[in-house]
Structures are given as C-alpha cells and as structure tokens.
C-alpha cells in the first residue's frame, strides 16, 4: 500500500490520495499516511462495544497473535478509535463505513454514530449487509438476512440526529 501511494504521489502529484481500511493497523500507519499526503481515510467500523463486535468478527490477527472473541473485538475497536483520533489530529478527513447487520448491530449503530462524531469523523456511511450465499461470505453461508430498505432508512434516520449520514451509497462490494 505504501509503495503504491508513494508512486502515485510522485507520478500524479495533484491527485487526492485516499484509502479505505478496517483500522486494525491504523494507529501505526497514520504518520506514514500523512507523510505520503493521504488526506482522506475511510474506516470500516461496525461496533464500538466488544460484545457486539465479537458477533461480527470471530478473530483478528494482531500484534503477532490470533485473538478471539471479546479480546479480539476490543483490540480491533481500540485500534480503530485510536487511529481515527490520530488521523483527525493530523488534519485528515475521516469517513466511517458501518455495515448494518440485522439482529447484531442494528440497535448499536446510533452509539457508533455518536462516538465517531465525538471523535471528529465528518461522515457516516451505513451500508446494508450483503449476505447472499453465492458470495461465499460467513454471514451469507450461515443464513444471516440482509436488511430491507425500510430498516436501512430507519437506522440512517436515527443516526442522522447525531452524525451526517451518507445516503447516496448503493449496495456494492467496493467497501
């Protein structure tokens, strides 16, 4: 990633550099990203509570160890929030993507919106879970239903009271 960003910066100096990340290694990367001229980062952050996050992520590989359950979830959340804060302190625009997973993080997303607003993120993009079995994802293969349009609109409305929402995003696999 860093080599690609450096090449782009050298060959296309006027192009805005932005990246998207799950945030697990973000705090350690912020200084390099800022030095390379990255001025916009999107962090996928689906929960700020380890109990909720542990239902989304079975494990993370962090600091040379495979962590599981709430320990994994808390490590991911801590890294995401620390990275978000460091980016803001360095003048980088931060957008947060959250995937709406019915029955798992739907009631929790307003708390996510409040936390990221308090940390300085400028935009929250709540996207519907893509859980079609043919995509081969964990949730798709295990029968997790996707949110319907009414659920998505309702959560975006709830979260919109504390944080600017991005509502023009269409369902895709890009984020």
Residue ranges of model-derived segments:
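Conserved AdoMet/S-adenosylmethionine-binding subsite of the radical SAM
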Residues: 1-127
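Auxiliary Fe-S-binding modules of radical SAM enzymes
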Residues: 110-175
């Amino acid at each position: 990633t860093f080599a690609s960003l450096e090449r782009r910066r050298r060959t296309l100096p006027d192009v805005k550099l932005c990246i998207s990340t799950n945030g697990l290694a973000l705090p350690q990367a912020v200084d390099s990203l800022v030095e390379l001229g990255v001025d916009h980062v999107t962090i996928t952050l689906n929960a700020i509570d380890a109990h909720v996050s542990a239902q989304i992520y079975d494990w993370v590989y962090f600091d040379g160890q495979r962590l599981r359950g709430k320990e994994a979830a808390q490590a991911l959340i801590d890294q995401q929030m620390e990275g978000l804060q460091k980016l803001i302190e360095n003048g980088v625009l931060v957008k947060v993507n959250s995937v709406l997973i019915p029955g798992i993080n739907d009631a929790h997303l307003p708390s996510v919106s409040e936390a990221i607003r308090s940390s300085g993120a400028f935009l929250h993009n709540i996207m519907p879970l893509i859980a079609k079995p043919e995509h081969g994802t964990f949730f798709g293969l295990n029968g997790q239903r996707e949110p319907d349009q009414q659920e998505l609109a309702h959560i975006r409305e709830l979260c919109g009271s504390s944080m600017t929402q991005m509502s023009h995003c269409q369902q895709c696999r890009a984020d």
